[in-house]
Amino acid sequence: MITAFVMINVDAARIPEAAQEISEIAGVSEVYSIAGADWDLIAVVRVREYEELADVIPNRVSKAKGVVDTTTHLAFRSFSEHDLDAAFSLGLE
């Protein structure tokens, strides 16, 4: 699984709407509003192939209403078992 963190600047009047629109894009697993940075939102994108990433970010996330600018960071490795636990969980207790 390829994981990317997309830092997003949004027109201040459109932050909630942009966050909702971005959260509904296939491949976007999470969207957070943030403070203390030069960005308004962070989206976590998880896809199987780089071709999907090359479509999701420039053609969908960047074109959501109100988005002004994006910067993308790719994850090389996860040091948390959270993702693995969730991936293999059957939901049985």
Regions found by a protein language model. Name each.
Residues M1-E93:
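A compositional/biophysical signature of low hydrophobicity enriched in polar/charged and small residues
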